[in-house]
């Protein structure tokens, strides 16, 4: 009996449905950490940014990612995912690095970081949006906002690059 229970658990763990659940859980955890990070980076942009565009983008990031995080937390709860309550260590380190900058340097590095970050986020969210669960539904609902953030970051990045 013990052998058959073990075999059943091994088969379950190897099943595509179990793998999809694990991928969705991982996605949600990363999304929640990312949302916390974006809220904090948005606040930082409002404090340390020089241009009105960077400050306005920071406000948008804080507002949009705070709202998105509530939806991500709801999706995590519905899937039984233990949600993180803060950005991850790498995100905190990036925030701390950026917190030491001000003015044009902050604006330039912030815009570059946001382009790279949102480009990766868009790829991750588009992949997850193909899933037919709460994580996929959450991802689908965020793609337009992420695209808007990506486009705005690119615009700010090109302005900062050309104004050197």
Model regions: which residues?
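His/Met- and acidic-residue-enriched segments that coordinate or traffic transition-metal cofactors
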Residues: 2-164
């Amino acid at each position: 009996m013990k052998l058959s229970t073990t075999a059943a658990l091994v088969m379950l763990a190897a099943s595509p449905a179990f793998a999809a659940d694990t991928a969705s859980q991982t996605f949600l955890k990363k999304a929640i950490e990312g949302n916390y990070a974006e809220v904090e980076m948005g606040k930082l942009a409002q404090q340390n940014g020089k241009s009105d565009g960077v400050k306005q983008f920071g406000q948008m990031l804080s507002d949009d990612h705070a709202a998105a995080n509530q939806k991500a937390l709801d999706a995590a709860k519905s899937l039984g995912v233990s949600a993180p309550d803060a950005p991850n260590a790498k995100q905190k380190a990036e925030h701390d690095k950026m917190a030491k900058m001000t003015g044009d340097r902050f604006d330039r590095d912030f815009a570059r970081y946001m382009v790279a970050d949102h480009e990766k986020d868009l790829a991750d969210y588009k992949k997850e949006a193909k899933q037919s669960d709460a994580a996929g539904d959450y991802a689908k609902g965020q793609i337009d906002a992420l695209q808007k953030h990506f486009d705005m970051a690119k615009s700010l990045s090109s302005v900062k690059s050309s104004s050197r």
